[in-house]
């Protein structure tokens, strides 16, 4: 692993200036190039990955978010661990790679699960690539390009943040554009190894560092010109073929609809079970009600008698009732049918006190009520 990384570092290192043989030197040393097995295999896999990323990026939306977070996290943590001292010790390349991959995997999971974070990283990647193209254009088109370190830093961060915000606003459009541009860049870098052993990568690295301008071979410009062409082709293919009729928002909505449908199905099943339980309980309750009716038969309906109509004269005072009792006591002293003093009437106490018969009568024979 260490020898492979050292080989890649040697390939990426700028050529020595001592043996300067003129401006055509970058194109002259073609026969002396030697290709290693491991870098060739890695570049071939990256080329295949770039093709999928360029032409099927938006279709593989979740995978794009995961790989973007994995790449950012792994590269940043690897550089920090390899260049800086951690706990007063210089970590080896293998340890730095392992730590970078571990933390990069966590970053990839975060960008995949939190969609807004993933879209922000996708837009940031697009802005960085556009910033690199801007720096190359400034270097070649300007007669006196700026050599300050803050210029590339400001261009990269400014364009990165701008495209990150735009990606959050127009998600489908800028996600398609970002995947096409990044996939084309990966294809170009992998091809550059087989053409010039990363001469284009060294040139871009010097432009970011604001280093002195060095002559490059015409094949470098051909490889660099393939980048925007492949990016445009990737956008067209995704727009018309691979991403047509597909939307990452519909995927989220369809999952929510599935959950809602499952909830509805569960509610229907619960209702059916509750109705079955009610039907089972109804015969038992009916039997209990019949038994209760047999034990406690309902009384027959009886019509309430009409209330007796009373008048003002029907109300008897307690004094009259007491006089009735006194007369009854007096009447027992005489035989039935005997004579009593005139002006009084013999009253039987079995008589209902609520009767409408007058209590006194005129002078005459005894009247038994």
Curated annotation (Swiss-Prot):
| Membrane-crossing segments per the record | 37-57, 60-80, 93-113, 117-137, 148-168, 181-201, 216-236
The listed locations are:
Membrane
Its source organism is Danio rerio (Zebrafish)
- The protein, known as: Transmembrane protein 198
Which segments carry the region annotation Disordered? 266-308
A single GO CC term for this protein reads:
cytoplasmic vesicle
Q: How does it sit in the membrane?
A: Multi-pass membrane protein
**What is this protein's gene name?**
tmem198ab
- Keywords, comma-separated and alphabetical: Membrane, Transmembrane, Transmembrane helix
Share an example GO biological-process annotation for this protein: positive regulation of canonical Wnt signaling pathway
User: Its principal location?
Assistant: membrane
Keyword Transmembrane listed = yes
Membership in a protein family: Belongs to the TMEM198 family.
């Amino acid at each position: 692993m260490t020898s492979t990384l050292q080989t890649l570092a040697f390939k990426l290192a700028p050529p020595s200036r001592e043996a300067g043989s003129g401006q055509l030197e970058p194109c002259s040393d073609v026969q002396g190039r030697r290709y290693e097995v491991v870098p060739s295999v890695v570049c071939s896999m990256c080329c295949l990955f770039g093709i999928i990323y360029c032409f099927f990026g938006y279709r593989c939306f979740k995978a794009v978010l995961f790989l973007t977070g994995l790449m950012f996290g792994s590269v940043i943590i690897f550089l920090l661990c390899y260049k800086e001292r951690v706990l007063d010790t210089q970590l080896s390349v293998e340890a730095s790679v392992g730590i970078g991959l571990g933390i990069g995997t966590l970053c990839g999971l975060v960008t995949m699960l939190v969609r807004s974070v993933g879209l922000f990283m996708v837009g940031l990647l697009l802005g960085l690539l556009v910033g690199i193209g801007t720096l190359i254009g400034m270097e070649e088109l300007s007669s006196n390009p700026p050599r300050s370190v803050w210029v590339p830093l400001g261009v990269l961060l400014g364009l990165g943040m701008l495209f990150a915000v735009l990606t959050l606003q127009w998600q489908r459009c800028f996600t398609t554009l970002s995947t096409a541009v990044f996939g084309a860049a990966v294809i170009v870098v992998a091809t550059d190894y087989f053409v010039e052993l990363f001469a284009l990568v060294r040139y871009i690295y010097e432009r970011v560092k604001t280093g002195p301008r060095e002559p490059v071979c015409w094949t470098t410009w051909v490889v660099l010109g393939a980048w925007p062409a492949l990016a445009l082709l990737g956008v067209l293919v995704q727009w018309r073929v691979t991403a047509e009729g597909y939307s990452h928002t519909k995927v989220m909505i369809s999952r929510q609809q599935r959950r809602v449908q499952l909830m509805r199905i569960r509610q229907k099943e619960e209702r059916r079970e509750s109705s079955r339980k009610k039907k089972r309980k109804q015969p038992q309750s009916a039997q209990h009600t019949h038994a209760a009716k047999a034990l406690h038969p309902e009384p027959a309906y009886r019509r309430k008698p009409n209330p007796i109509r009373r008048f003002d004269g029907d109300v008897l005072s307690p004094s009259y009732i007491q006089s009735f009792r006194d007369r009854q006591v007096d009447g027992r002293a005489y035989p039935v049918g005997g004579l009593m003093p005139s002006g009084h009437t013999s009253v039987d106490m079995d008589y209902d006190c609520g009767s409408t018969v007058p209590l006194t009568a005129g002078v005459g024979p005894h009247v038994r009520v």
